[in-house]
Amino acid sequence: MWKLFLTIILVFASTAVKANHSIVVYNVDTNTVIKEQNAWTVRPIASITKLMTAIVALEHYKLDDKLVVRKKQYATAGTLLTSLLVRSDNQAAEILAKNYPGGRSAFIAAMNDQAVKYNLPNTRFIDPSGLGVFNTSTAAEVAALVYFASEYDFVRTVSAQPEIYTVVKTKYGYKERPVYNHTSKELLVEFDNILLSKTGYTSKAGRCITMMIEKNNQKQIIVILGEPTKQRRDNLARQLIAQNSL
């Protein structure tokens, strides 16, 4: 299906869109491109990289595997993946990579191998966090990456949570308190049909977000790359969630 999707969007891609950002809105169930702008522009994707980090980690680790954080300090793979997807934790990405067989370089190689497997020729990773300017892709290929990431129950469940809670003991008894706030918390609180969400930002990548939503009992993938401000990115996301349906 995704080879067909990438072919369709290449055929119908705009050739002269006067916009600095890249956009794709894609209906998964009908295999229909609803909207696209600069869908094949190769650009940095910042922390959207972490979707591939999560895929490679979930293919190798069990959620209760204990990974070395530093000498005599450990964290489970599940805890690190939660921090990775909710807080967009760069350190969690590095720990997941360093504990991989063969270390960090082997983990990054596995990320790029997975991109080849998914038929994403313009997608390249040089680190597990997305901080590097050469972690690049296109809006079209990010949409495909979101689809593949959504096949993992853990990614869907965790990345759609506005907050992750923990139980702490206080003088008034045990209470739930948020331990992680999602980087797209405002949108996740505002809309109850977001099934997966990941943001990204570096000075070179701009403000980025990708989501899978459910609308009219059909799944849609939204990708926005390269907006100059968080407010503009989120307002555009609101418009695309509210307006587009096929």
Give each language-model segment a name:
Residues L4-A13:
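Sec-dependent N-terminal signal peptides
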Residues V11-F12, A46, L196:
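Residue-level signal for helical boundary/lining positions with a hydrophobic bias
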Residues F12, T53-V56, Y174-K175, T183-S184:
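Intrinsically disordered, low-complexity boundary segments flanking structured domains
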Residues A16-D153:
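Active-site-adjacent loops and short helices of periplasmic peptidoglycan-processing enzymes
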Residues N20-S22, G102-L246:
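Penicillin-recognizing serine hydrolase domain
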